[in-house]
């Protein structure tokens, strides 16, 4: 018998399994759930012995691991719970140093929702000329605010600080630059955290489903208000690149040049899957409470984890190999299940920094809008039909236009992991691989055949892979566009992945400036 076996047998027998008492899950009503009740309930679960007791050192062959990462999350929940007894823990996401456009005219949304009124937060740089034809509309990514560059009212550097200003990419000596917070956001524009004027309560998940096109229509209401008939250019990166293309398709006569950086003409399965995973993690946080958390503890743990997942898609493996490698934060200590490798501490920091800087419901709604994005003609025609039907209901006096019901749709047979004939490489090949863009997408992008379009992709981008930008360019060419420009930055130029559009002033900024001039 092995000596180790003898030692192992000398230890006490393990504890008998503890039978957990079932507890009832209360579905939150429209009213916000009581914060103190939910917090006290979680404490009671820990104190009533419903969980297995940690074995004492003399009963165990090894000491129990410590979990400072979980301790920190529990401490944050306790702090937010204490704050909620006062004015509420939900942070103010914006400092208010922006301009605000308010529309009293209802906005019909693509999936039948209706906003009786809405606000769009925006900031501007440069001077609007007399003809009002020097306007560049800058579109943001998913979680960005209108603060793309510092202003006199808000000197804090913006998310595109180095790209905007005199002599820079968006030259404010020439152009009047407008950047908005998108509809559905939480930085001053109407979104789930906004009060519904119909009943004086925050929308929460009563907010209607959005599309990228809905966001663009709201932006053009702002342009109408400012008296801007036609944009000199529509510029955007990531989700903003999707908006930039959508602006040209929806309003071809009102858009001049188009710039789409690290975007796509339709969302693809990998990107949808990654955003779905983020939403699932967030929605599984008990504090999310089906969206009605505004008078309680915000789902900071779910937001933190969702951001960590997102950060994995924003940068690239090669960059992290060079930056972090396999280094541990403290090699002198024994490995832990909490963040230990440098890459783990980086992700932990990214999640912690973001978890209270953005509204959870806004993340859910806007990321879903990205998933729904498809500029193919079939989807455009279906949307047109939906809007006509919704408008007919409104005209007939129907109060509720959209159907908020939902069912969990699962396949009748389990998914097969082995490839089938319908998923062959030939059938799933992209436009860049086959040299032929899908006819449906070619027809959908036909309104852009006479526009000057710049498409930029990054080889190290895993969220919006470079083949998706090649698909845009090749689709436009087949649609009859003879002036489209396509640039792909290789790994020898940038290893920053999807975030390259935020960091590479020389290559991204230089290409955009040359195109605009």
From Swiss-Prot:
Transmembrane segments: none annotated. The active site is at 238 (nucleophile), 461, 498. Residues 1-46 form a transit peptide. Residues 141-144 are annotated as: Important for substrate specificity. Keywords: Acyltransferase, Amino-acid biosynthesis, Cysteine biosynthesis, Mitochondrion, Transferase, Transit peptide. Residues 416-436 have a biased composition (Low complexity). Pathway: Amino-acid biosynthesis; L-cysteine biosynthesis; L-cysteine from L-serine: step 1/2. SUPFAM superfamilies: alpha/beta-Hydrolases. Residues 134-386 form the AB hydrolase-1 domain. It comes from the Eukaryota. Residues 36-66, 413-436 are annotated as: Disordered. The record marks 275 as: Important for acyl-CoA specificity. Substrate binds at residues 307, 499. GO terms for molecular function: L-serine O-succinyltransferase activity; serine O-acetyltransferase activity. Residues 36-64 have a biased composition (Polar residues). Its EC number is 2.3.1.-. One of its GO terms (biological process) is cysteine biosynthetic process from serine. InterPro entries: AB_hydrolase_1, AB_hydrolase_fold, HAT_MetX-like. It catalyses: succinyl-CoA + L-serine = O-succinyl-L-serine + CoA. It is found in: Mitochondrion. One of its GO terms (cellular component) is mitochondrion. Transfers a succinyl group from succinyl-CoA to L-serine, forming succinyl-L-serine. Also has weak serine acetyl transferase activity and homoserine succinyl transferase activity. Belongs to the AB hydrolase superfamily. MetX family. This is Serine O-succinyltransferase. It comes from Emericella nidulans (strain FGSC A4 / ATCC 38163 / CBS 112.46 / NRRL 194 / M139) (Aspergillus nidulans).
